[in-house]
A protein has these predicted regions:
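A short beta-strand-loop structural module common to alpha/beta enzyme folds
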Residues: 42-56
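N-terminal carbohydrate-binding/catalytic regions of secreted carbohydrate-active enzymes
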Residues: 32
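Short gly/ser/thr-rich secondary-structure transition/capping motifs
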Residues: 1-2, 56-58
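Membrane/wall-proximal cationic-aromatic binding patches
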Residues: 1-16
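Catalytic nucleophile-elbow at a beta strand-turn-alpha helix junction centered on a G-D-S/GDSL motif
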Residues: 12-29, 80-82
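Alpha-helical cap/lid subdomain in secreted, periplasmic
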Residues: 10-12, 35-41, 57-217
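Short histidine/acidic/glycine/proline-rich micro-motifs that form metal-
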Residues: 22-25, 49-53, 136-139
Length: 218
């Protein structure tokens, strides 16, 4: 059930639109939106996650979200912004070419686009907005990408406070777990093991975030 395929005519259930990228879409990883839908039939859960989207892309389809007149909007977006903001040419070129970006990703652009999306939803709907920090990327706390993710999460926390949003700190769900993994990253057998564990972690921790989300939309 995505943002383009839902018929809400004559349906008085509260509408929850879950906005984001592949983490929300759930096609590759754990589909936490479907899990919420299965656990709670008192609301309509609409999956507005699109694989590989950046926040700019989310703004291009904001009208599809608003038209559902949501009671709740969840936001989990920025992982691709964080990855693309690294000064690595082939990664940046990939996002520009495949996602039709008008410029190279940058944290300042992320902040601007995220605030734009929040303001649009806040002022054009009556929805309660629930925003989440980004999850970890990789398994090592000293990896360069973690510094990038933390900077993007600072943006999320700041905007959450500025606009009085409900914050779910998904990053913290991963933090202790990742810190406890002192194995050598990405060796062949270890990488296979971590791939399997990651699937379990996503089920455990994203489902945990889903439960936390459920509490916030009662």
């Amino acid at each position: 059930m995505d943002a383009h395929s839902v018929n809400l005519v004559n349906n008085d259930k509260p509408v929850v639109v879950c906005c984001g990228d592949s983490i929300t879409h759930g096609h590759i990883g754990y589909d936490w939106v479907s899990s919420l839908r299965e656990k709670d039939n008192s609301k309509i859960y609409i999956n507005a996650g699109v694989n590989a989207d950046l926040t700019w892309n989310l703004n291009q389809r904001v009208d599809d979200i608003i038209k559902h007149n949501p009671d709740y909007v969840t936001i989990l977006i920025g992982t691709n912004d964080a990855i693309g903001s690294q000064n690595i040419k082939h990664i940046q070129d990939y996002y520009v070419e495949t996602k039709g970006l008008p410029r190279l990703p940058h944290i300042d652009w992320y902040s601007s686009e995220l605030e734009k999306f929040i303001k649009t939803v806040k002022f054009q709907t009556h929805a309660q907005i629930i925003i989440s920090t980004l999850p970890w990327l990789g398994e090592q706390s000293d990896a360069k990408i973690i510094t990038v993710v933390k900077a993007h999460n600072d943006v999320i926390r700041s905007l959450s406070e500025k606009y009085n949003l409900t914050l779910i700190d998904l990053f913290k769900h991963f933090e202790d777990l990742i810190d406890s993994n002192d194995s050598v990253p990405y060796t062949t057998t270890e990488w296979r093991r971590l791939r399997g564990l990651r699937a379990v972690f996503y089920i455990m921790y994203l489902d945990g975030a889903g439960i936390e989300l459920e509490r916030n939309i009662d």
